[in-house]
From Swiss-Prot:
Residues spanned by motif NPA 1: 154-156
Membrane-crossing residue ranges in chain numbering: 97-117, 128-148, 170-190, 212-232, 240-260, 282-302
GO molecular function: channel activity
Membrane topology, as annotated: Multi-pass membrane protein
Protein species of origin: Oryza sativa subsp. japonica (Rice)
Gene: NIP3-2
Leader peptide range in chain numbering: none
Annotated tissue distribution: Expressed in leaves and at lower levels in roots and anthers.
Entry's localization field: Membrane
Stated name of the protein: Aquaporin NIP3-2
Amino acid sequence: MEGGKMSSMGMDAASASVTVPPMQMQAGDQSNRIAIIISPRAGSSKILPFELVNGAANAGSQRHADPAESTPEAHHHLWHPVDLPKIKPPVPLVKKVGAEFFGTFTLIFTVLSTIIMDEQHKGVESLLGIATSAGLAVTVLVLSLIHISGCHLNPAVSIAMTVFGHLPPAHLLPYIAAQILGSITASFAVKGMYHPVNPGIVTVPKVGTVEAFFLEFVTTFVLLFIITALATDPNAVKELIAVAVGATIMMNALVAGPSTGASMNPARTLGPAIATGRYTQIWVYLVATPLGAVAGEGFYFAIKL
């Protein structure tokens, strides 16, 4: 009897378990959702609804169970090979030195030729023409050579860049040698082409020594401030480097040209001096320009911080 009761109770329990309605999810019903947190070891730490996790697990098991039925959607989250950008090899030092020689030769040849044309043709070029010639030469050379050597074309620039870590110290002497040699070569080329060569191609102060020193210091200071701001700061507009540096050369030439020749460049002064044998107060240009360059670059980093 009791066995009958037990069996009937078991049947009642079984029938009760069958008659319980399944839990249904209604759209927008957040009370029946179960959320799980993926452990930090997993690929994600997002909180996902239980039914999404369960569905993803079922989809994964189906892919492993029947690979033949795989679809592009099933492989959507799989890793695919990615083409990494190719790293360009560094430019050899010999090519950088060659670029500095060519660039300095072109710059000095252009400036000296413009000065000679102005003197031989009764001021046809004028100060504005000479300044424009120098600025345009620097602009096109920067556009052409900056990706090879940095297009310094100036020992003062190379010295300042070395002091602040933008040029390896081992590259400094080869750079300066190439720049001076390019200037000397251009000066002798001009001397051989134009007869007679007017001594006006040499930068000689037409003002007092202190004023000349100050002008060369300030103009080189401004030049290196602009170069450093555009060439070394990742936040600068790199597309304007050539135009800005060329405009700075032109501006400084208009300011200091009548007084000192607006050298801003020891190579600009040294090459013509050797070609003509005139060394009047050359120390002003060889000392003031590197000091102004280091001060200009240092000032930019000081106000940037």
